[in-house]
Amino acid sequence: MTVAALALALAALGWLGAGRGASQGEPIGLFTTLPILWADSPELGSELRPDATPHWALKVFADRGTIEPLDVLTPSHLAGLRRLVIAQPRALGPAENVALDDWVRGGGHLLLLADPALTLDSEFSIGDPRRPQAVALLSPILGRWELDLLFDDRQVMGETSREVLGLETPVNLPGRFAARGQANCRLWADGLAVTCAIGKGRVVALADAAVLERGDPSGTRPRAFAGLLDAAFAAR
């Protein structure tokens, strides 16, 4: 789905611009393969049905600013943003890695969700470009920040709750970050999360994306995601 189509869908749902209680704060860039802005369904226009339920994360975003969907990461796309969420993205191209690194070092605040073994179910078949990215492939940009994303394949699948930055956060087959001894990064929950001061900017990264799944009978996900956003976007 293109950015134009996403913007149309968001406007129809009332989540773009000043709709449905959105604050007048700064825009928040969103770069993701997860079905947050659209329905995980091959049916055309399914997210615009009157009975369609918007993803709960849209309200969390709207409480903090307006969503700016991104298809690519370039200097021109990032220039008007100070806040960015990258959630289980596709692999970045070389120029995108440079643009993102420059943006963070110039003062950008990034929340990154990088899942090495995504457990989210999808109606799209394996190989369909609309299917969420199964494995985070972010070694080049993480390497620029002297981080490694690791995965223990001996884990048993199943959702659990872990405390991250003081937040009870649902995870499922999470990875962990390893730092290379740099003083500007701090690991949390045995590496499940990491916070880094990079240049004038900040990165808060979580090695799992289960927090953004739609199902949430306990209300844990919105609280955890809101806390992660606030940690990433707080002034330095």
Model-inferred region functions:
Residues 1-236:
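Short, surface-exposed patches at the edges or C-terminal ends of soluble domains, predominantly
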